């Protein structure tokens, strides 16, 4: 996840006469030397050896990719594409995630509401038997035997790309045809739930997909629902949540621990030694609708990253916290957005590390590896519903 707003452009900023490859590589050099969190550990490479600025950037940051600190977190994009993704999670696709179960069967692991897959009533756990790429159906085994690529199987990210799916559910087999279209990822999978238990207040359950702007009003309604039901125990399902906006993470932290940590640092942002003046400590604030849970269980996988890990790390000093699933991805850093003036280019660059209010961070190989969290190991059984 990146910052809630683009950072200042690097100084000095010069208007560019052109947006050619050479100027883009110079832009990368100017920004990375000033802002990159580990600027002193960059590879010594020659810009002239690279045909495009992205490959040059990846060559520069290669030493940080090897040890897992920056495995592709820094990249070039366009301002329009970046803003669309962070505001609504917009992309072009069929609207499903997939995985393989313990018998290596291909199954849908998540189906987005309002997507082509959702409109076709496909569901998590449905088994895909075969896919029609342009003509006859080919079984998953046949596609694997001929080493069909993901791009070939699912097609380009273009509106109108069509694929057929032969699907099995509870012994019944049916076929659907899906056409890709532009989608906005729903922040929640379904609605927040109240899980009843005899003689006790209910448990609140939320499956949270992404820290995007569209989530903000939904999180307020979630908090109101749980507060009105006297919820003190929460299950927050972040198994596929790869992060997003810090502003949304702040909102969620304030809902969970704004009252408990009032006046304390919620989390801290630490930059390189050239940019220590940018370091900030963000304090907890009490929102209009707050929860003060006693216990929280976070469902996590290696797909749980960035803002998701920040929230878990920051709330843990205030609430009894347990992780359920497997270790998280390990994205303890954030990017800023740098725009090349006069061009469409935007550089998303790792520029800061996130720490909780007690100064704890460094979860580059996952939260569990820090030794500060209890993990209840559990497999993500994609044959079953989320809850």
Q: Model-predicted segments: where are they?
A:
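N-terminal Sec signal peptide cleavage junction
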Residues: 1-3
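Flexible, low-complexity junctional segments that flank or bridge functional domains
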Residues: 6-234, 248
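C-terminal "post-core" interaction segments
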Residues: 199-206, 213-233, 241-387
């Amino acid at each position: 996840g990146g910052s809630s707003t683009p950072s200042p452009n690097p100084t000095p900023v010069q208007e560019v006469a052109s947006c050619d490859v050479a100027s883009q590589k110079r832009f990368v050099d100017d920004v990375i030397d000033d802002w990159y969190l580990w600027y002193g550990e960059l590879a010594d490479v020659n810009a002239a050896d690279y045909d495009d600025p992205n490959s040059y950037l990846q060559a520069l940051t290669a030493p940080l990719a090897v040890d897992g600190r920056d495995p592709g977190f820094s990249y070039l994009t366009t301002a329009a594409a970046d803003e669309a993704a962070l505001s609504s999670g917009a992309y072009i696709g069929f609207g499903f995630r997939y995985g393989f179960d313990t018998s290596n069967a291909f199954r849908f692991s998540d189906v987005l509401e309002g997507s082509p897959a959702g409109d076709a009533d496909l569901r998590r756990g449905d088994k895909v038997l075969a896919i029609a790429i342009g003509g006859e159906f080919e079984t998953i085994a046949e596609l694997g035997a001929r080493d069909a690529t993901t791009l070939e199987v699912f097609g380009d990210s273009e509106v109108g790309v069509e694929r057929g799916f032969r699907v099995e559910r509870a012994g019944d087999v049916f076929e659907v045809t899906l056409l890709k279209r532009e989608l906005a990822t729903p922040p929640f999978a379904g609605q927040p739930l109240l899980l009843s238990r005899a003689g006790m207040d209910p448990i609140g359950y939320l499956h949270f997909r992404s820290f995007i702007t569209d989530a903000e009003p939904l999180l307020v309604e979630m908090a109101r629902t749980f507060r009105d039901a006297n919820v003190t125990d929460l299950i927050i399902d972040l198994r596929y949540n790869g992060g997003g906006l810090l502003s949304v993470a702040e909102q969620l932290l304030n809902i969970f621990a704004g009252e408990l940590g009032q006046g304390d640092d919620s989390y801290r942002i630490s930059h390189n030694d050239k940019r220590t003046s940018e370091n900030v400590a963000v304090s907890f604030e009490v929102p209009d609708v707050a929860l003060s849970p006693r216990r929280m269980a976070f469902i996590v996988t290696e797909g749980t990253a960035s803002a998701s890990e920040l929230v878990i790390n920051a709330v843990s000093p205030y609430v009894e916290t347990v992780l359920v699933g497997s270790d998280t991805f390990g994205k303890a850093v954030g990017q800023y957005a740098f725009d090349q003036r006069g061009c469409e280019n935007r550089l998303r660059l790792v520029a800061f590390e996130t720490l909780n209010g007690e100064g704890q961070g460094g979860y580059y190989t996952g939260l569990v590896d820090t030794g500060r969290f209890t993990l209840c190991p559990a497999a993500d059984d994609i044959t079953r519903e989320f809850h």
